[in-house]
Amino acid sequence: MRSFRMRNLLSRVKKKTIKNRNRNRNCISITKELAHLVEQEEEEVNEEGFNIKSSAPSHTHGVQPLGNLYLNTSSTNSRDTGLGNLHTLTDELVLDILGFLDSTSLGVLATVSKSFYVFTNHEPLWRNLVLENLLGGFQYKGSWKSTYVSACYPSFDNFAIVLGGFKVRDFYSDYLFQSWLCANLEMKPEWLERDNVVRKRGISVEEFVLNFEEPNKPVLLEGCIDNWGALRNWDRDYLVRLCGDVKFSVGPVEMKLGEYFGYSDQVREERPLYLFDPKFAEKVPKLGDEYEVPVYFREDLFGVLGNERPDYRWVIIGPAGSGSSFHVDPNSTSAWNAVIKGSKKWILFPPDVIPPGVHPSPDGADVASPVSIIEWFMNFYGSTKNWKKKPIECVCKAGEVIFVPSGWWHLVINLEESIAITQNYVS
């Protein structure tokens, strides 16, 4: 069994080669720009336009970018000395192997060396343990490890929190540092400046079909959901009163809405979980009553499928930094996305242009891309300025609706806590 799992692991690592090569190549330049970040964690940092959020904590375990090791020639990397013969493995492969361990084994391994202490405390390992073992039945405690310990070993709760922040000297890792960096980096102003989407207000259905739907072009529509009850009513307090104890789909689990907001208030991670539920109107009929399909999208051939229709509408709630990396909507569908609260940054590429840093498989079933949305902005956004076919970009605000044509690649990131409804359709 172990050999089978290892073969499967090595197969997965091979599939990630392109993604990792891009991440590591770009990380070298980033760490040179940000090599002094760790020494100035408590201050506002501005290096080549990169700014760390004012509320950002220092790296919990003192991990530094590899560029700092190059600047400190008298130092040795405790990452390598602490891993022994395993030091030749990439950081990601080490973490993939540790992902096979349970919580007790991780705890024991953390005592072996400083290096294993850092690796076994990597938050995504504990996030996976929480989601796999506790499903959605947890209250977030500021970190995934503290959440797991609090739920499974209540008597050790405070003790674990105290021990969770030991700093290790002379530990250098681009992979681990960039994970922290992506979780705490502010969006650069230049990432938000470009707004080249066509905006329309009050156009007829015929104009929409002729100028946008038939030629398969994006458009941002203003004023077409002004009569929604959702636009007037849906804020956090209203939703918690209405359905705070109702469970909604959040990543691979279901969570009560009130507990999800407790998570989103505290979370500081590279890929925040966001609520994305296709059955919201069935679970809470009043939510379905407080919106209607905008007039431009009511001709929907999916309707002939009746109860056999695949999931087609979702409520989306998430904190700043959450969102969707580049993808194409399934089943040759188009989509509309209406922002009810907050704001979202959109980037769209036409079907014949694959976004930089994105590597779809030949059949399109799998897509290799940067680990997080912020990582894509850091490493690839700048290159689009020189492309002949530039992406369509915009910030979609509350009360606005964006039309995403069939086959278009699109990325979206919440700039603040946001609530939206999206629906796929075929016309």
Predicted regions and their residues:
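N-terminal accessory scaffold of Fe(II)-dependent oxygenases
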Residues: 2-401, 409-427
